[in-house]
């Protein structure tokens, strides 16, 4: 009998569901046996008429339908087996963002706040998308973050980032419970790439300005209305936008517009802190976006920059500290909390700078020693440059972050070499960042996304779950491949889960459309072509993000354009010529083969400046467009699209 009991007990324990995989990892899980599978008449039942509760229920229903094709009706009343039940209920231990889920023959979701309730729906969607039955393991979840601020900073100043991408980025961040996006709205290139001439050096300010018409960049900007709408969309997804106007350094866009406020001593990317006109100009600029009942800057925080100003002389250090204090108080005058880049160890001086209720990006300990800043009263965002800065193809910082190290070793309590207690009350949380330092380096928005999506997943774990990760990185890395970017979002342009032929057509008719807008890295596109006379600018395919030319607009060669860059192969199809064309693309190169032979492998190219003293890596990648065929005369047949590089399976 004892043997039978032991065997039975072992079987019972084995049947208990282990902690399910989601990103970020769940804090607490109590497993039961069995699964919940929603029936065809499954509903989302709301336990009250709270407007936010109903809105979140509708968002959950919309996302569920978009991801899985099943409509969940939103109802009130008594729940039955197979239903999802949403309620707002007090639970102090869950905090501002926590939630609880009990999965039995129904799914009971509760949270003390709408934020926590929304995060719970992200967890349920991730659980459901990992199996075809959309089943959920029975058990109880209690989940809450270690750090209240979990974010990312994107440099839109040096490279224009389209609003459509920013909107998708918010959805992606929300899907992984990342709640803060800092949008860097102005910056400039490095003058060594522009003949060492500040007047020729690229600079951009990305917001519409009525106070200073002509300040706004002409190669890409956001209207006030679309930026307001964007921030409100983010709020509806429980993501805060922190807009940043970077002054008094990184300010060449401002001095291009008004040269007299530029510093002759420290460079025209520095504002002259000794001129009253500088303050008049910057006051009016901030005021434009802060004043009124419906200001352009919607959220509770505004970033005033203060990054990397010269500390060459004591008088300029004191002026910089006074400038910083002035704009902290200036934005506070409009009811906003000020955010600054850490600089006050670099600019060590006597002039007091307000610290109470001020947030600081702790990015480099030489610029702002975190222990000193905490002692002085600042609230820190951990964003250590040596660990979490991405600068694409620059040759310094990271091109791709070291995710295994970050997953195993880092939390926001690690700021450079300084290590603090986990959940330190003065460390709000963490961010990572992408800086587009090298203007003109060929990097596309798709390349940027390829660099940030994976670490966004990894760092969401380290900012939510903190040091208590329960699975090894290798397991995490394998399992996250099952997850989407977000409901309805596929910026990576992934098609299919395993390496295979994902699309084919016997004939491509001019003007026809395909089942997919584009395919991302890695891919192979091949087709047979019988050439005909084509005018320059003839397209083979286009998508919202790129064009592939049979005959490019400049030289009539085969090539492609995206993000304002045109890249051409040394090849064109002549009238009457028959050829088999193959294009392979990955995150480093784009390769053209004709009849099985490599014509050109467009990998990273080195550009030289100033008689070879300076150089820049130029990237020639392509997420291949498929959405619509062009109006070509040639005959295109036997189109095949693979989601891997055929030459390197």
Where do the language-model regions lie?
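Acidic, contiguous N-terminal accessory segments
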Residues: 4, 12-145, 338-347, 354, ...
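Hydrophobic faces of well-ordered beta-strands that scaffold small-molecule active sites
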Residues: 150-154, 181-183, 241-245, 300-304, ...
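Flexible, acidic glycine-rich loops studded with aromatic residues
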Residues: 352-358, 365-505
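Extracellular glycan-associated modules
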Residues: 495-649
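Active-site neighborhood of glycoside hydrolase catalytic domains
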Residues: 254-359, 363-379
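Active-site beta-loop-alpha junctions enriched in small/polar residues
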Residues: 157, 186-190, 246-250, 307-309, ...
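Feature activates predominantly on carbohydrate-active enzymes
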Residues: 93-270, 277, 283-301, 436
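Conserved, mostly hydrophobic/aromatic
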Residues: 44, 64, 113, 152, ...
């Amino acid at each position: 009998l004892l043997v039978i009991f032991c065997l039975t007990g072992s079987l019972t324990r084995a049947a208990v569901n282990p902690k399910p995989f989601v990103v970020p990892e769940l804090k607490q899980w109590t497993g039961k046996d069995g699964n919940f599978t929603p029936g065809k008449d499954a509903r989302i039942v709301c336990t009250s008429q709270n407007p936010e509760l109903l809105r979140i229920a509708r968002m959950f229903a919309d996302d569920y339908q978009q991801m899985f094709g099943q409509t969940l009706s939103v109802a009130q009343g008594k729940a039955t087996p197979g239903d999802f039940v949403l309620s707002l209920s007090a639970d102090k231990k869950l905090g501002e963002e926590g939630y609880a889920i009990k999965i039995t023959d129904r799914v009971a979701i509760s949270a003390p706040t709408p934020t926590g309730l929304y995060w719970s729906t992200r967890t349920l969607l991730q659980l459901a998308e990992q199996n075809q039955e959309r089943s959920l393991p029975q058990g109880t979840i209690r989940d809450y973050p270690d750090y209240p601020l979990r974010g990312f900073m994107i440099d839109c100043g040096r490279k224009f980032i389209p609003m459509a991408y920013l909107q998708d980025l918010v959805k992606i961040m929300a899907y992984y419970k990342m709640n803060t996006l800092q949008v860097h709205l102005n910056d400039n290139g490095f003058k060594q790439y522009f003949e060492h001439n500040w007047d020729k050096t690229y600079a951009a300010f990305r917001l519409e300005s009525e106070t200073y018409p002509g300040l706004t960049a002409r190669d890409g900007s956001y209207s006030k209305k679309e930026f307001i709408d964007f921030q409100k969309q983010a709020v509806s997804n429980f993501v805060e936008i922190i807009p940043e106007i970077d002054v008094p350094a990184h300010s060449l866009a401002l001095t291009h517009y008004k040269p007299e406020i530029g510093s002759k001593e420290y460079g025209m990317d520095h504002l002259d802190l000794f001129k009253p006109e500088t303050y008049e100009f910057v006051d009016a600029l901030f005021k434009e976006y802060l004043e009124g009942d419906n200001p352009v800057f919607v959220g509770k925080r505004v970033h005033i920059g203060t990054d990397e100003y010269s500390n060459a002389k004591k008088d300029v250090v004191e002026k910089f500290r006074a400038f910083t204090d002035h704009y902290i108080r200036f934005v506070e005058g409009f009811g906003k909390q000020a955010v600054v880049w850490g600089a006050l160890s670099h600019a060590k001086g006597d002039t007091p700078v307000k610290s109470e209720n001020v947030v600081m990006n702790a990015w480099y300990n030489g610029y702002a020693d975190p222990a000193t800043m905490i002692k002085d009263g600042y609230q820190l965002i951990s964003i250590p440059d040596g660990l979490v800065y991405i600068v694409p193809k620059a040759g310094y910082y990271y091109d791709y972050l070291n995710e295994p190290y970050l997953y195993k070793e880092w939390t926001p309590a690690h700021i450079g070499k300084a290590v603090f207690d986990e959940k330190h009350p003065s460390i709000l949380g963490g961010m990572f960042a992408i800086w587009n330092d090298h203007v003109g380096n060929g990097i596309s928005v798709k390349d940027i996304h390829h660099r940030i999506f994976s670490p966004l997943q990894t760092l969401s774990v380290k900012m939510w779950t903190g040091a208590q990760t329960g699975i090894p990185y290798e397991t995490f890395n394998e399992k996250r491949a099952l997850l989407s970017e977000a409901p309805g979002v596929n910026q990576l342009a992934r098609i299919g889960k395993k390496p295979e032929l994902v699309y084919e057509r016997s004939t491509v008719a001019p003007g026809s459309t395909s089942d997919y807008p584009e395919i991302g890295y890695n891919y192979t596109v091949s087709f047979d072509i019988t050439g005909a006379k084509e005018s320059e600018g003839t397209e083979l395919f286009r998508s919202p993000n790129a064009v592939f030319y049979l005959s490019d607009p400049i030289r009539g060669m085969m090539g492609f354009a995206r993000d304002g860059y045109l890249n051409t192969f040394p090849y064109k199809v002549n009238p009457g010529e028959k050829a088999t064309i193959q294009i392979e693309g990955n995150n480093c190169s784009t390769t053209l083969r004709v009849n099985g032979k490599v014509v050109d492998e467009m990998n990273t190219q080195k550009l030289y400046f100033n008689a070879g003293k300076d150089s820049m890596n130029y990237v020639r990648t392509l997420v291949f467009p498929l959405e619509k065929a062009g109006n070509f005369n040639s005959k295109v047949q036997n189109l095949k699209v693979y989601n891997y590089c055929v030459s390197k399976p």
